[in-house]
């Protein structure tokens, strides 16, 4: 089953109007898991690519029923959205000083009420004992392999 998250094309809008990299989208994932189980799924393995790793990791952090999922597969996942913003910003605007991205993050927190700290899922993933397959190439321009290395260690 492939699901879409709130704020996606044709999907329900989050009250914020923004895709929050799992902070709210994990609820959509939980609904999809329940749907699969109610319709006969014997095992549930979640697969998240890039930003799709956020909702999975947020689900780990927020669920009261971790036993519903039998495994996770991640490909170049975003487990820390602040780092993703900085890396993507530097890739798209290499002439800007790196410190300016901290200002943009701070401004987004104030202007849009985004809680970037709530989108740091690294410890939740590290402390979860569900089987996980994590792979990530070292030429990824958007998600640094060091973020996956941190999880793997």
Task: List each language-model region with its residue ranges.
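Catalytic histidine neighborhood in serine/cysteine hydrolases
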Residues: 152-153
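Short beta-strand immediately N-terminal to the catalytic nucleophile in serine-hydrolase-like folds
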Residues: 43-48, 75, 135
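Hydrolase active-site cap/lid region
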Residues: 58-115
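Conserved alpha/beta-hydrolase
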Residues: 1-13
